[in-house]
């Protein structure tokens, strides 16, 4: 065990970590048995649905359709008629969030985060653009087709700056929907549809319009997420797999991408939630023009493979009334952790989350108190980590140097046993191997060298390095955050690939400063590493590459100091 093999092992482990995320971007959750999805023709063909039309509800035996006179229930004669003359929009505001609801169907047509911006500087819209039809909080029937009420013009019964109540009582039926921002900034909703048991509430499909860069990045994901009984699971949209979740034990369920979340926290009256995958056909500006139900992934045709995939949340009520809270916003860890619903678990910091969370807090502090630039905050954070780990690094270096000094003596022992490692029949000579190892261990003992002394300090550092790496890929704070010059978004790749190329050059220089192993195979592996790292980091977020580049530069400086001190001692 020497420093060259250890360095090679560390570099390979980092490469494997990044390559694993590239090849296997999301670990599939434990499969819950589901019923065969309905919603296809007898021949198994996928049904297509116009924009805003929900998909047929899969699962279980089909429920006989209600007669048209029942589906389009008449107005309740005991209540005064409540029908609006024209469509009207109601705006609710809470701090930096702005919700816009239409009285047509009493649906959420816009949810804007003023502090978050698009690439062109506009406030970020979380409701995915569409050409019309079903919006979040729309009403659908047992077959997931829109109820006639979904297109009705609801009267506005009451309103104030943070809440509104819509009511409809007319030829299309009777319903009441109330929306309000609560003290935590969540949008609460209460929906009542009296006299019928065939309705559900639909939310989605998906969340916000992803950019082309986000769709092409392996670091970006879109999925459904839920907490059932304290276990948080995700289901990637690419799997196109339907799930049905019981209400018992369900803390939240939602749709997410890497940075934003739309989640429902059940209140009262929820019977079950269906995660229905759909394919999206889009038009100008990414607006959804049509969505197509996906009974199962194997029914997606070759022509449909290129279509975007999302989840539609279908909330089934137990009776007339369904009440819930909903979170619409960024997956900002500190914001989510302050809420009592466990939504902070949707921020995926990986295996070393216990280390990544304080690192994120430190990054916030540096940004808020020192530099006000997340790029420079990453640089300073990397310097601080390097300083904190300096005692371990020094201990590792001293131990490795002692091992290097012993290399000639160890090689002499190996040379003496070189011709004795096999017997006359060509079989391994275990006795000779045992004696050689005993002599080497005796040499370690006599020289006061611990063969693991150089390895253990570096292994202690790895969780910190991995956690910082994972934190940078999950931090929404880096989205649209500039650094300097041409780097305008630390969450996306360098458009000119300057950072990854410079990073690979520093990797090469770092290896040149480290004594190369005598083994030609190891030497070739070391020579390949800068090219492997370049390949892995070309499409990586520039914030992540900046961290790695800074770490390489600091390591080069550190190695240069060690080499200089060694030369002075040998002089």
Predicted regions and their residues:
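Soluble non-transmembrane domains of integral membrane proteins
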Residues: 89-346
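Short secondary-structure boundary micro-motifs
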Residues: 6, 73-76, 82-85, 94, ...
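A generic alpha-helix propensity feature with a strong bias for hydrophobic helices
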Residues: 28-32, 36, 53, 57-71, ...
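Juxtamembrane extramembrane loops of integral membrane proteins
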Residues: 22, 26-122, 126, 130, ...
